[in-house]
């Protein structure tokens, strides 16, 4: 926490230093009493964050805002976001990412351009299966079939389990490398009503997770390597994940949509409506490995309860569906965004449903919601910066409305037994333990948060959420940036 506070102080000081280098210019205020920012505002700072799903995050980022002559403040005319960071969990670096985003409203007359690029590496990405509660999450079942190795890694894990009751979750993990590039364009049709068009490219490579120091379900793999198995590997064995999709692939997609946006402030809205509807087409002739066609709709509203943004009720309702009966499994965790933000990774976690385990909800058609009260309890000026603190109380939820085909067909069973009768029987017997004959239920959570807000754009969030069903996880704490919506 001390590191986070030091980071906030450093960003204020850097912004103040940048302002000090400008010519002595009279400070001007808008109708809300805020200092109108002009020119380039820099926000370099170390990344110090925490995500319950990925662990402690460290690295560096740069926020660069161009307010020009200030006539559009608090909305910048253009902005850059650059980040290089990594996550460490259990004293090991499990994932890292490199991101460069650029947004410009003036380069092309009448058109807003947003470009997002990123490389993401996850050595141990959460995977809990498809269709929500149809996939059983049961750590007690893992505990009964987990064996620690005799080496130092195994001894350390065994000690943690004995002293803290902490079980390794490698059974519910796989590895992933991901490259994402997108370019989106927005233009006004009528006041507050816009067209949207864009192109996105992603390359995904999936690998099995190889645990160190322990084995899960060793009876399912009695080979000389004795590495046990994982849910991802079992899904391949059961034929739920097709062979040609198992290792990932390329998605090359065209996007089109409409947007209504009457927000008063883009990054910290206190009133207005922001609604979007999109169609996404990724045919094979465009270079896609496995064609897919999707649609999405999102409605967000910000209702002022007390004037001047003191108290706001905000909510988001979102739905994403598949135009067909199938889609590549490795694309299901993503929810399409258009604009400066990259596509949300996973239904569950900080950007979609707080408290819910990352990737817990996956299906062909998925919906989710967020509802929260935001109370800006103090605001002041410090070193020529507009500073505010806000509290929030929220509830989030998600549901799979149409599921992915989870059948363990006779053909898949015969193929599994033919490959290796001994391990095949063991793996086939595990199907009924992890895939239930039921539809998804409602996943929900509730929590609260605190935010530091500078110049209506740079926002640091501290949030805690807890799920109502242990199948979705327990409590989750996050330190991150911005509002969810």
Segments from the language model and where they lie:
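Gram-negative/organellar outer-membrane beta-barrel architecture
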Residues: 34-42, 49-250, 347, 471-485
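Outer-membrane beta-barrel pore domains and translocons
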Residues: 49-51, 63-65, 85-89, 116-120, ...
């Amino acid at each position: 926490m001390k590191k986070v506070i030091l980071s906030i102080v450093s960003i204020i000081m850097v912004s103040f230093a940048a302002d000090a280098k400008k010519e002595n210019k009279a400070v001007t205020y808008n109708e809300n009493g805020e200092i109108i920012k002009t020119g380039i505002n820099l926000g370099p700072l170390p990344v110090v964050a925490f995500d319950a799903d990925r662990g402690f995050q460290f690295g560096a980022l740069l926020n660069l805002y161009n307010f020009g002559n200030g006539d559009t403040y608090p909305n910048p005319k253009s902005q850059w976001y650059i980040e290089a960071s990594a996550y460490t969990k259990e004293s090991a670096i499990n994932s890292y990412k490199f991101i460069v985003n650029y947004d410009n409203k003036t380069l092309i007359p009448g058109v807003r351009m947003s470009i997002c690029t990123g490389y993401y590496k996850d050595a141990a990405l959460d995977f809990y299966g498809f269709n929500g509660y149809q996939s059983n999450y049961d750590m007690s079942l893992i505990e009964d079939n987990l064996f620690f190795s005799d080496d130092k890694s195994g001894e350390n894990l065994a000690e943690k389990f004995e002293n803290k009751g902490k079980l390794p979750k490698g059974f519910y993990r796989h590895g992933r490398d991901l490259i994402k590039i997108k370019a989106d364009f927005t233009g006004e049709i009528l006041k507050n009503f816009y067209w949207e068009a864009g192109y996105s490219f992603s390359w995904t490579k999936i690998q099995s997770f190889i645990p160190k120091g322990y084995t899960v379900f060793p009876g399912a793999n009695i080979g000389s390597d004795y590495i046990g198995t994982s849910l991802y590997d079992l899904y391949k064995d059961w034929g739920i994940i097709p062979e040609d999709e198992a290792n990932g692939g390329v998605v090359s997609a065209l996007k089109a949509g409409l947007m209504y946006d009457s927000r008063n402030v883009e990054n910290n809205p206190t009133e207005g409506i922001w609604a979007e509807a999109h169609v996404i087409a990724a045919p094979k002739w465009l270079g896609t490995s496995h064609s897919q066609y999707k649609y999405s709709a999102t409605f967000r509203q910000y209702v002022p309860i007390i004037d001047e943004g003191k108290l706001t009720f905000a909510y988001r309702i979102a739905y994403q569906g598949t135009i067909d009966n199938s889609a590549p499994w490795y694309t299901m965790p993503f929810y399409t965004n258009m604009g400066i933000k990259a596509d949300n990774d996973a239904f569950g976690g900080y950007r979609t449903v707080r408290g819910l385990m990352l990737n817990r909800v996956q299906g062909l058609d998925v919906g989710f919601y967020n509802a929260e009260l935001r109370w800006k309890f103090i605001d002041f000026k410090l070193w020529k910066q507009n500073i505010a603190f806000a509290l929030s109380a929220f509830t989030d939820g998600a549901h799979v409305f149409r599921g992915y085909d989870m059948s363990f067909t006779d053909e898949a069973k015969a193929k599994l037994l033919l490959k290796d009768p001994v391990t095949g029987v063991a793996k086939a017997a595990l199907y009924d333990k992890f895939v239930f004959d039921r539809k998804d239920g409602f996943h929900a959570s509730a929590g609260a948060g605190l935010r530091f807000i500078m110049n209506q754009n740079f926002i640091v969030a501290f949030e805690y959420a807890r799920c109502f069903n242990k199948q979705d996880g327990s409590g989750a704490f996050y330190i991150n940036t911005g509002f969810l919506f």
